[in-house]
């Protein structure tokens, strides 16, 4: 899904639905959520999201689709959507501890909600735990830039991108962020 191969994602969902007899409640709920997302039934997907995460808060695939700023909540058009994502991540945090992946997503949610100081602490924690995490690098660039510290974002991204594969998923996007910082610096 993340790679933009909609047909493959739809085929995987169809295959999952074909073998859904006898699945656990968790698996059925997971498939049901994604069925609603893929069908474009955003409000129904959001309604299914919260009970699913209440029962299975560590379903990281569902969390990632819900927490992404352009995901099911962020792309819903709802008023207050950024705050809803930050609140959801706050509520899930105790289930993830110091997990670098979750912490990077939580930091982005806080940043998008304007909670920049809290976001900075979390993104620094995430990057320290796994300096190779591209989502963490992305979050660090966002938080620094939005906090009025583009020089730190620029220095970080210049160094970080030097070792990241040019065909890596985030390479183009992080290069764009670096370009914004360069423009801000007058370059």
Question: At which residue positions do the language-model features occur?
Answer:
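"A position-specific structural signal for the A-helix of alpha-solenoid helical repeats
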Residues: 31-35, 65, 105, 139-142, ...
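Long, internal scaffold/assembly segments composed of regular secondary structure
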Residues: 142-187
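Residue at a conserved register position within TPR or TPR-like alpha-solenoid repeats
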Residues: 36, 70-73, 110, 144, ...
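Inter-helical turn/loop elements of alpha-helical hairpins
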Residues: 1-43, 70-82, 148-150, 186
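Short coil turns that delineate tetratricopeptide repeat
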Residues: 21-23, 57-58, 97, 131, ...
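Canonical positions in the second alpha-helix
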Residues: 16, 51-52, 91-92, 125-126, ...
């Amino acid at each position: 899904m993340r790679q933009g191969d909609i047909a493959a994602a739809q085929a995987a969902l169809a295959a999952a639905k074909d073998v859904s007899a006898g699945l656990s409640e968790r698996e059925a709920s997971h498939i049901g959520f994604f069925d609603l997302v893929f069908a474009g039934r955003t409000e129904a997907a959001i309604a299914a999201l919260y009970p699913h995460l209440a029962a299975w808060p560590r379903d990281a695939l569902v969390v990632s689709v819900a927490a992404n700023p352009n995901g099911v909540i962020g792309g819903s058009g709802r008023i207050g959507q950024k705050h809803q994502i930050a609140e959801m991540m706050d509520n899930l945090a105790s289930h993830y501890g110091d997990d670098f992946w979750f912490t990077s997503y939580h930091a982005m949610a806080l940043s998008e909600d304007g909670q920049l100081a809290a976001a900075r602490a979390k993104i620094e924690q995430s990057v320290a735990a796994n300096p190779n995490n591209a989502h963490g690098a992305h979050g660090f660039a966002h938080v620094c830039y939005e906090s009025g510290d583009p020089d730190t974002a620029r220095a970080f991204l210049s160094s970080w991108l030097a070792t990241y594969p040019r065909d890596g998923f985030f390479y183009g996007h992080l290069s764009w962020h670096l370009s914004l910082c360069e423009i801000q610096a007058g370059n």
